[in-house]
Structures are given as structure tokens and as C-alpha cells.
Amino acid sequence: MPSHANRSSGNSQMRWWVLALAAIAVSSSYYNDDVIGPIADLLHRQRGFSQSQLGMLNGVISIPNVALALINGLLIDRYGPARIAFWSAAIGVLGAALTAIGSPYELMVAGRFIFGISEGAIFIALLAGLAQWFSRSGIALAAAVYLSLARVGSYAVDTSTAWAHPLYQRGWQPPLWFGTGIALAGLVAASIFYWLDRHHRPELQSKAGEPAQRLDWAHLLKFDLSYWYILGLHVLYAAVFFPFRTTYAIEYFQHAKGLTLQQAGVANSWVFFAAIFATPIFGLLADRFGHRALMLTFGTLLLPLTFVVLGLTSLSLWVSTVMMGISFSLVPAVIWPATTLIVAPRRLGTALGLITLIQALGMAGSNLAAGRLADTAGAGSSNPAGYDVMLWFFFLLSLTALSSAVLLWRRETGPDGHGLEEVSAKALATEHA
């Protein structure tokens, strides 16, 4: 008995180290996910890339997610989340290296595609791995911290134009090789994560007679209406936020707002920096006061307002940055826990897989469409007005996201709600549909 108690105490302390390793690994993935944005102008000037080519470099990483969304759960169940995280990190290093070699253009696209295989798997694998280390009462806090620390990677790559300025002075390639080094650090963290998981992970207490859930194609689309509303919000919000912020924002700030590369990178980074600290706070507020659907509606409303401020006013860039920062902190903090309240536990894997699949398609399509629109309008440093059509595209897309949030709010305040508007204790007691 004492030895068992000591082992439990040791595992309780070790799980925080495991969380730190997972955060390092996923942060390296987030860093390389966004690595094209800061060098977009350099790729324009030094290699003559078009807006469509830049859009492809970011859009292509979403393509593997379509397939991985359907098989990730099966791979994790078959081989274990820690092993999948390790192999995903290794694939990510390969993709980052090919991207850094970067010539010809097709090799760079191939590198981004290979990195997309890693990016699509590692986030879910690490999160599933953490669920095996943390109890049911602790996984929510662990997931919030994990998500916040993951965004350190996004913040770091945006601010790299300032703290790694000498790299950017040397051209487009050194920042990509630096990103490869970051990916290698993530692989080291994933390796240690895998080793600790193999030798020290707490024993899982499975419920007798509870069969493993499989993807049921016959009932794939049989979800409650609230699920389809929140799926629409997942997809449309991501299709607006990530293409704009990771592909086009820095270049737009340079050409349309007159910022230097360093200033544009810092302005863009504050959205991710705020999310690092604010995401757990909004999650705690939702648990404390409820009104999750209302919070999602408010957070999504800030998205179209941001593009109105950018395109139709002369307000300081920091106004739109603060608005988008609040939105990006609030919506992810609430939408994932809200999804788990709407969907029955036995079907949660299928539900999240379907969300991930359609979300990947939406982000890839939005990236390519925005780039094509900007190219057609002749957007660039000599024609800042050419970016207006891209802003209108994102504005209209964000309005459709807002409509999904409003529909979800209306349903959840009626008799068919799932407890999203209630405080956590009541929500947990609500019957899953």
C-alpha cells in the first residue's frame, strides 16, 4: 500500500512535467504552422511568389487533416497517443526541413503538405495523451493550459521579426531553417513524453463491459440540431480567423497600413499573446456563470466588426487587434467544452472528427479563395486598395459564422437546450442528447 501511494504521488507530480513536454511539442508545431506569414513579403520580393502561391503554402497543410480527421482516433486507439505524437513530431521535422530547402516551389509545397500530416495529428494525440495522465476533474484545467501554451508558438513566430530580426535581414530561408530547429526541439520533447508515457503513466481503470467506440458511418449524420449549429461555428470561425491572421495580416498591415515588417509582426502577435493568458480566464467564467452560447455569440460578433474597423475606418490598428484578440481568446475557450456538453460521450470522437474534417476543408478553401481574390484585384504595396475585396470576403464569411452562433444561442435558450447557458454543475447534470 505505501509503495502504491508513493507511486500515485509521484505520478501526480510527474503529470505536470508531462504537460510541459506536451506544451513544448505542440508549441513547436504552432510555430511552424504560422512560419510563412512573417516571410510573405520576402517571398514576394525575392522569389516573386503570387498571393495564390502564398495561399497554397498555408492552405496545403490543411489538406492532410481531411484524411487524418477520420483515422486519427483509430491510430491513437491502436498504437497509443504518445507513440502517435512522437511519429507526428518526426514527420513535422521532415516537413519543416523540406520547406526550408524551398526550391523549387513544388518542393516547398511538398514540405508544407508533409508538415500538415504532423500538424493534423500531434495536437489531438498530445491532448489524448494528457487525458490519460489527468483525472476527469483535472483534464479541463490541463487542456486549457495546454491550449494557451500552444499559442506561445504562434506568438513567438509573429514576434520573431523583431527578436530574430538578423535572420530576416539575410533573406527568406534562414527563418525557415530556424523553424526547423524549433521543430527538432518539439521532437525531443515528444520523445521524452513518449518515454515517460511508456514507463510511468498511471494505470488506466477501464470500465468492465464498456466496448471501444468505432466510427459508425450508418449514424454519422444523426446528431442533435445544436451540434450542426456549433459545427458551423467551428468551421466558419476558423475559415476567417486563421487564413487572415496566419497568411495575409502581416502583409496587409505592411502594404495597406504602412507598417514595417517588424511592426506588423508585433501587431499580429498580440492577438495570440492575449489568448495565452485570457483563454483560461474565459473558460473559468463560462464554468462560473454559464451563458456559453451567449458568450460565443458575443465573441463571434467581434469578428465582422474587426473587418469593418480595418476596411472602413481610420482607427488605430490596435483597436482591431484588441477586438480580434478578445474574440480569439473567448471563442476557443468556450466552443470546445460546449461541444462536449452537446454531444453524448459515446459519440464525441465521431463528432470531433467530423468537425476537424470540415474545418480543414474550410480553412484550405478560404486561404485559396482569399489569395485568388487579392491577386485578381492586384493587391500589393503599389495598390493597397486591392486588399479591400479580401476584407469583404472575410467580413461576409464572419457574418455566416455569427448566424451559426445566434442560431445556437436561440436553441440553447429553448426547451431543447443542453445546459450551455447553465453553470457547470447544472450543465454536467444535463442529459446528453
Task: Give the label of every model feature segment.
Residues 34, 62-70, 154-155, 272-280, ...:
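Residue-level signature of mid-helix packing/kink "hotspots" within the transmembrane helices
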Residues 36-37, 225-272, 276, 366-367:
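Extracytoplasmic gate region of multi-pass secondary transporters
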Residues 67-106:
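Conserved MFS/SLC helix-loop-helix module at the cytosolic interface between two early adjacent transmembrane helices
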Residues 292-338:
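C-terminal transmembrane helical hairpin of 12-TM major facilitator-type secondary transporters
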Residues 145-198:
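Helix-loop-helix hairpin linking two adjacent transmembrane segments in secondary transporters
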Residues 48, 80, 101-107, 135, ...:
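Helix-breaking motifs and short loop linkers at transmembrane-helix boundaries and internal kinks
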Residues 111-150:
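Cytoplasmic helix-loop-helix junction between adjacent transmembrane helices
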Residues 4-12, 197-231, 423-432:
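Juxtamembrane intracellular "pre-TM" segments in multi-pass secondary transporters
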